[in-house]
Amino acid sequence: MGLLETVKDPRDLAKLSGTELEQLAGEIREFLITNVAATGGHLGPNLGVVELTLAVHRNFDSPRDSIVFDTGHQSYVHKLLTGRQDFTTLRQQGGLSGYPDRAESEHDIVESSHASSSLSWADGISRARQLTGEGDRFVVAVVGDGALTGGMAWEAINNIAADKRRRVVIVVNDNGRSYAPTVGGFADYLASLRPTIDSLRTTPAYERMLDWWKKKLQDGGPAGQFTYKSLHAMKKGIKDWWAPQGMFEDLGMKYIGPVDGHNLQAMEHALNTAKAYGGPVIVHAMTEKGHGYAPALANEADQFHAVGIIDPETGEPTEMSGARSWTSVFAEEIADIADERSDIVGITGAMLIPVGLHKFAERHPERVIDVGIAEQHALTSAAGMAFGGLHPVVAVYATFLNRAFDQLLMDVALHKAGVTIVLDRAGVTGPDGPSHHGMWDMAMVQIVPGLHLAAPRDATRLREELREAVAINDAPTVVRFSKGSVGSEIEAIDRLHDGVDILARRPDGSTENDVLIVSVGAMSELALDVATRLGAQGISSTVVDPRWVLPVRKSIIALAARHRLVICIEDGVRAGGVGSRIRQEMRAAGVDTALNEVGLPVEFLVHGSRSQVLERVGLTAQKITHDVVAQVLGTKVPFARPLPGQEHPTTGSLPTL
């Protein structure tokens, strides 16, 4: 039995010697490489926080002390140390979440895993502890250097620093290669001195002495005030030369570091010092993403930030998909458009490769801007670029557009800015769970005046609709597509005057059908399957792809009037979604055909594969067909319009309101 198997609770770490802790760190790395290689997941970040997480759990008493991870993908080691070592079904339906999950453990606090929020959580928890008489309990926020590019983190630091009584320890996990620690003899000498200096600067006696001299000098008239200002400036100059702490301490936070995040003894010393101070402290830990795993370190792109199923020895994928991804199609097309138009600029929020702007950046590096994890800034900056004569293309994951809704509404849409927003990972994404499903976007943008929304069904339509989007310069445009592989090409049998594609209708070409099926984006294949199944039941249908779901095309409303029932199949939430908007337009036009929204419930959907999640919520051809047949037969609401000579179905079985 290895040491890892003996750790059932963080308190078990206290029994281990320094040598045993080093052995445990090695076992954890081996465990992560073996298990994450088999399931996929965030391997590189977790290999980089092994010693850091061990030190945090050795020095703080979880769950009495709250540990918050920003972002939660770096919590695998935390899970292992808190009794969750069954990683065989990590990120799979019924298995462990890839992020902290309160349902799994009392040691988990924050589940959302959208970056830059942990310090606000720490601020709130520590305030609550003070007000409820539990101010002796610590809050530890483990935050990546990338998350500190988000403005929300600095808003929180500003508030945390204002109260010196709160026991907040912010551990900055700095694995950015552009912030690598200085090497060499002189740097090693400074590093050997730094623990002594940090110990002095974080003692209460040192703080009391500074406050006493400050008051004495400031009360000493002009001469004393001049002396204080001079000494304070000299102290600050020496401090800024000695360590990169000025940015934090200017905000009123004590700073310890930089510390080697892979040196357990150094990390424990730093955390002990921070703990003894008793007030807000930042511990700056320098780490290496993918530490201890050569294939990760050799990966220049992202050091195995997130991997699929790989060979643990080589790091090579074990399954090569021949299908093209939505992202790769976008990457090629936006780069080609940029070649043709010098006014096109790309904006990303710290995700150049994942959102497909890398080819654009390779060809035109001066026209691709990485703003960091700052979606709010990205949208307003884009509005400014549009005002200046450019056409920005902001590429983000669909779930992260939520963070910038006010900027979309008030900075982009209100000013009719020609900004194109490309939403990757729209709809159900699968293994990463509720905080990463891109299922809220369509309902959210429905209420933005003047916005145009496209949902391509295949690669050809993505290229086509992206070009149409960047041709609009007097309103915001949004193009959304799914995660993963693009399906087969689905050719239209007709395109109507306003751009709506007819994908299927009765063989004789008649539009007098029972059911109008409106398919949104990647749901077209499912919609065609439903139409085939309905045909086998003797129910005729027309299948349309609006291509541009906003504004609602008039031909959709005209077709709805000539059918007995409309169903809208979408991979966004039903409430306020595309179907809801079509219903409103139908009623405004006096069309009383019943409409059924077939989409996602307003729920936080737990992780699983995309197909498993869709099956759980009833977005399958079998379930949709079953419901539509019942609606046409008049046994399930909404009832299809009766045929001539038929009466409306009885509603005696319905509840009385």
From Swiss-Prot:
Pfam families: DXP_synthase_N (PF13292), Transket_pyr (PF02779), Transketolase_C (PF02780). One of its GO terms (biological process) is terpenoid biosynthetic process. It comes from Paenarthrobacter aurescens (strain TC1). Its EC number is 2.2.1.7. This is 1-deoxy-D-xylulose-5-phosphate synthase. InterPro entries: Dxylulose-5-P_synthase, THDP-binding, Transketo_C/PFOR_II, Transketolase-like_Pyr-bd, Transketolase_BS, Transketolase_C, Transketolase_CS. Thiamine diphosphate binds at H73, S113, H114, A115, G146, A147, N175, Y293, E375. The keyword Metal-binding applies. GO terms for cellular component: cytosol. Belongs to the transketolase family. DXPS subfamily. GO terms for molecular function: 1-deoxy-D-xylulose-5-phosphate synthase activity; magnesium ion binding; thiamine pyrophosphate binding. The gene is dxs. It catalyses: D-glyceraldehyde 3-phosphate + pyruvate + H(+) = 1-deoxy-D-xylulose 5-phosphate + CO2. Binds 1 Mg(2+) ion per subunit. Homodimer. It is an enzyme of class 2 (transferase). Mg(2+) binds at D145, N175. Pathway: Metabolic intermediate biosynthesis; 1-deoxy-D-xylulose 5-phosphate biosynthesis; 1-deoxy-D-xylulose 5-phosphate from D-glyceraldehyde 3-phosphate and pyruvate: step 1/1. It comes from the Bacteria.
